[in-house]
């Protein structure tokens, strides 16, 4: 490890706004060394379209990491498979996108990189290329040999983790099992300690049903699943509050001393977070043997190369990755 964090950055879909965001954040001095895994020609061309200065330096893992000056990027070259037109997807570049991710994961696992920041990928075009791909999280978990990862989104001091992720609403109740819920809470508690430097995390847990089940009259998941799991983990030292009604949990009185919230399903917790932190929310994958943060938006093909893409979420993802790397690696 180095005293200056070395952060791997994958821009994602080359026809989307990922390269725009990388060029934009390069205009701001960074406390870490950014190592962008991309095609240098792509970054130079996107900088030209945006009218921004860009100096590219080749990555040398033998050289100690040093903070990047404004207008400069360190690049670990990965050639495109086909020319890129902003806003126009091409299946030929699907393998390029995955190659950058493969290389970034390998670098995080072998210690060359201290954290990973991922730009938005286009799942559809990767699958259209004949490569099964469900998303960053699953890809990173498989490549790093991790068990079921946990999705956490953050906007400022508000952190919301999910007990279930991308499921139809009718499938959510059956997906909340004692073993699954315990796993999520243990991962959340442990990563808040190691990656966020919170010595005794205080976690608020939502109920599944309206009014947290109203004593069993509006559903029994709180009584039969959620409550017993919380009780068992409390006896092991976890500081868990709940199950609480979600409609009152997200109020200043409850949030004031909370380090994280566990929502039972995607649209229970994320609308509040995105309302509070629109444009600066960050997606974080917990439970991996590496630090990964990401933007909380898509490829925005229609904005690529236009200069109209907002870099707020990317900059926050980078800032948080650096902060987490310092906590986890003692940098």
From Swiss-Prot:
Pathway: Cofactor biosynthesis; pyridoxine 5'-phosphate biosynthesis; pyridoxine 5'-phosphate from D-erythrose 4-phosphate: step 4/5. Disulfide bonds: none annotated. It is found in: Cytoplasm. Keywords: Cobalt, Cytoplasm, Magnesium, Metal-binding, NAD, NADP, Oxidoreductase, Pyridoxine biosynthesis, Zinc. It catalyses: 4-(phosphooxy)-L-threonine + NAD(+) = 3-amino-2-oxopropyl phosphate + CO2 + NADH. Its main location: cytoplasm. Its cofactor is Zn(2+); Mg(2+); Co(2+). The keyword Cytoplasm applies. One of its GO terms (biological process) is pyridoxal phosphate biosynthetic process. GO terms for molecular function: 4-hydroxythreonine-4-phosphate dehydrogenase activity; cobalt ion binding; magnesium ion binding; NAD binding; zinc ion binding. GO terms for cellular component: cytoplasm. Transmembrane segments: none annotated. Substrate binds at residues 136-137, 274, 283, 292. It is an enzyme of class 1 (oxidoreductase). Its EC number is 1.1.1.262. A divalent metal cation binds at residues 166, 211, 266. Pfam families: PdxA. It comes from the Bacteria. Binds 1 divalent metal cation per subunit. Can use ions such as Zn(2+), Mg(2+) or Co(2+). Homodimer. Catalyzes the NAD(P)-dependent oxidation of 4-(phosphooxy)-L-threonine (HTP) into 2-amino-3-oxo-4-(phosphooxy)butyric acid which spontaneously decarboxylates to form 3-amino-2-oxopropyl phosphate (AHAP). Belongs to the PdxA family. The active site is located at the dimer interface. This is 4-hydroxythreonine-4-phosphate dehydrogenase.
């Amino acid at each position: 490890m180095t005293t200056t964090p070395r952060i791997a950055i994958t821009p994602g879909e080359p026809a989307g706004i990922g390269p725009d965001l990388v060029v934009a954040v390069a205009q701001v001095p960074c406390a870490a060394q950014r190592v962008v895994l991309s095609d240098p020609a792509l970054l130079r061309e996107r900088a030209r379209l945006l009218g921004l200065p860009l100096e590219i330096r080749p990555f040398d893992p033998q050289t100690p990491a040093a903070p990047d000056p404004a207008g400069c990027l360190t690049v670990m070259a990965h050639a495109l498979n086909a020319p890129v037109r902003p806003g126009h997807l091409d299946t030929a570049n699907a393998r390029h996108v995955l190659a950058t991710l493969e290389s970034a994961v390998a670098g995080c696992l072998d210690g060359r990189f201290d954290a990973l920041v991922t730009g938005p990928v286009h799942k559809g075009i990767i699958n259209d290329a004949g490569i099964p791909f469900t998303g960053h999280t699953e890809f990173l978990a498989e490549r790093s040999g991790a068990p079921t990862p946990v999705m956490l989104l953050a906007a400022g001091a508000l952190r919301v983790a999910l007990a279930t992720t991308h499921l139809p609403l009718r499938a959510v109740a059956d997906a909340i099992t004692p073993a699954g819920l315990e796993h999520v809470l243990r991962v959340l508690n442990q990563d808040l300690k190691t990656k966020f430097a919170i010595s005794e995390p205080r976690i608020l847990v939502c109920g599944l049903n309206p009014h947290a089940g109203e004593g069993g009259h509006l559903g029994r998941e709180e009584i039969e699943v959620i409550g017993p799991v919380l009780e068992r983990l409390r006896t092991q030292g976890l500081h868990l509050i709940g199950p609480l009604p979600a409609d009152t949990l997200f109020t200043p009185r409850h949030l004031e001393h909370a380090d994280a919230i566990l929502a039972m399903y995607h649209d229970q917790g994320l609308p509040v977070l995105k309302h509070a932190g629109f444009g600066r929310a960050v997606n974080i994958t917990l439970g991996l043997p590496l630090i990964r943060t990401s933007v909380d938006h898509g490829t925005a093909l229609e904005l690529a190369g236009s200069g109209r893409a907002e870099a707020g979420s990317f900059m926050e993802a980078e800032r948080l990755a650096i902060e987490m790397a310092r906590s986890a690696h003692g940098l």
